[in-house]
C-alpha cells in the first residue's frame, strides 16, 4: 500500500507545525513548499532529524518547486502575509489574492486531484480564490476556520466553568471574522445546555456574552500579545484534524468553510462559509442543522460580510 503524501504550501510557523504534527500523527510523507530559498529545506531537514526521536519513519522534503507537489493526496495552504497588530484579516485581501493565484496554478498543474485545505486569511475569500485558480471541485476543497473558532470557544467555556475541555461541545458558524456566530443554543457541557447552566447560576449571561465576544476576537487577541505574528499551534492542529478525517475516512462532522449551494442556510448564491461539514474519503459534505432565529439573523449578517468581501475580491481581479 502506497504511503500518503501531504504537501504543505507555506513554510512559516503554521506550515512547520503542520509538518511536525503530520509526522507525529503518521499521516504520510511530507513535502514542505515555500518561495523563500532555503527555508523549507532547512525546516524539512530539522524535521527529518526528529523522526528517529519521535519513532516515526517518513520522508520530509523541502522545496521551492511546485513540481514536487505531484501525486499529493492532501494539500494544506498557509502561504500568504500573516496578520500584524492593528491589521484585520480583511486588510490582507489584495496581497493574498495574488498568492492564491500562484498557489492555485501550482495545484492545478501538479496535483489537481488532491484534497485541498486553505488556512490563509481572509479565509472565506481565499478558499474561494484558491478554487477559482486551481479548478478543484467543490467536494475536494475546504477552508479551516470553524474548527479553530470552535476550539477557542470550547477553551474559554471550559476555563470559565472549570471543567475538562473534552466535556465541552461548542460550535461556531459563519465567516472567519468579527461576524462569526458561536452557537450558544447548540453548545453544551457534558450534555447540559449553556442555557440550563445560566439558569442554574453556573455562569451568568453577561459572562457568556463576554466569552462569545472573546471568541470572535480570538485571533486578534493572540496577534496583540505576540506583536510580531499570529496564532499557529491551534490553526495547525485544526488543519491536521481535517486532513486526518479525509485520509482515514473518519467521517468527522466539523465546522468548516465549505461551499454551500444557493438555498442552504438562506444564501442566494453558492458560497464558501463556515457550516457543519462531514469530511470523509469522498471529500466534504455540508450539513444542515437547525439553529435559533437569533442565530439565523446573525448568520445572515456574517454571510453578507463574506459576500461583500467576495465582491471586493472580484473588483481587485477586474482591475
Swiss-Prot record:
Binding site for NAD(+): 10-15, 34, 96, 119-121
A molecular-function term among this protein's GO annotations: L-malate dehydrogenase (NAD+) activity
Gene Ontology BP annotations: lactate metabolic process; tricarboxylic acid cycle
Active site: 176 (proton acceptor)
Tree of life domain: Bacteria
Pfam family, one: Ldh_1_C
Alphabetical keyword list: NAD, Oxidoreductase, Tricarboxylic acid cycle
Catalytic activity: (S)-malate + NAD(+) = oxaloacetate + NADH + H(+)
UniProt-annotated binding residues for substrate: 83, 89, 121, 152
Family recorded in the similarity comment: Belongs to the LDH/MDH superfamily. MDH type 3 family.
Function (record text): Catalyzes the reversible oxidation of malate to oxaloacetate.
HAMAP family the record matches: Malate_dehydrog_3 (MF_00487)
Protein name: Malate dehydrogenase
Annotated source species: Francisella philomiragia subsp. philomiragia (strain ATCC 25017 / CCUG 19701 / FSC 153 / O#319-036)
Species lineage: Bacteria, Pseudomonadati, Pseudomonadota, Gammaproteobacteria, Thiotrichales
Gene this chain is encoded by: mdh
Amino acid at each position: 500500500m502506497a504511503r500518503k503524501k501531504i504537501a504543505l504550501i507555506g513554510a512559516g510557523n503554521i506550515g512547520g507545525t503542520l509538518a511536525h504534527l503530520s509526522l507525529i500523527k503518521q499521516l504520510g510523507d511530507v513535502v514542505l513548499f515555500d518561495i523563500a530559498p532555503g527555508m523549507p529545506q532547512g525546516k524539512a531537514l530539522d524535521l527529518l532529524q526528529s523522526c528517529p526521536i519521535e519513532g516515526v519513519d517518513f520522508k520530509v522534503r523541502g522545496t521551492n518547486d511546485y513540481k514536487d507537489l505531484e501525486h499529493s493526496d492532501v494539500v494544506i495552504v498557509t502561504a500568504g502575509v500573516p496578520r500584524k497588530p492593528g491589521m484585520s484579516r480583511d486588510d490582507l485581501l489584495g496581497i493574498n489574492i495574488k498568492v492564491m493565484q500562484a498557489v492555485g496554478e501550482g495545484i492545478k498543474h501538479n496535483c489537481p486531484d488532491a484534497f485541498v485545505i486553505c488556512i490563509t486569511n481572509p479565509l472565506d475569500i481565499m478558499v474561494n480564490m484558491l478554487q477559482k485558480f486551481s479548478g478543484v471541485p467543490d467536494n475536494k476543497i475546504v477552508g479551516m476556520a470553524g474548527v479553530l473558532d470552535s476550539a477557542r470557544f470550547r477553551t474559554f467555556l471550559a476555563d470559565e466553568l472549570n471543567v475538562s475541555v473534552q466535556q465541552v461541545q461548542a460550535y461556531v458558524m459563519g465567516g472567519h471574522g468579527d461576524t462569526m456566530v458561536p452557537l450558544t443554543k447548540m453548545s453544551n457541557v457534558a450534555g447540559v445546555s449553556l442555557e440550563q447552566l445560566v439558569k442554574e447560576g453556573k455562569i451568568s449571561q453577561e459572562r457568556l456574552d463576554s466569552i462569545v465576544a472573546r471568541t470572535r476576537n480570538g485571533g486578534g487577541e493572540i496577534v496583540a500579545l505576540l506583536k510580531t505574528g499570529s496564532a499557529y499551534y491551534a490553526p495547525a492542529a485544526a488543519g491536521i484534524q481535517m486532513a486526518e478525517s479525509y485520509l482515514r475516512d473518519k467521517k468527522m462532522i466539523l465546522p468548516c468553510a465549505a461551499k454551500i449551494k444557493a438555498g442552504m442556510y438562506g444564501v442566494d448564491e453558492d458560497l464558501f462559509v463556515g457550516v457543519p461539514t462531514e469530511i470523509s474519503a469522498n471529500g466534504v459534505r455540508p450539513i444542515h442543522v437547525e439553529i435559533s432565529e437569533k442565530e439565523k439573523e446573525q448568520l445572515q449578517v456574517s454571510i453578507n460580510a463574506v459576500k461583500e468581501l467576495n465582491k471586493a475580491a472580484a473588483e481587485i481581479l477586474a482591475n
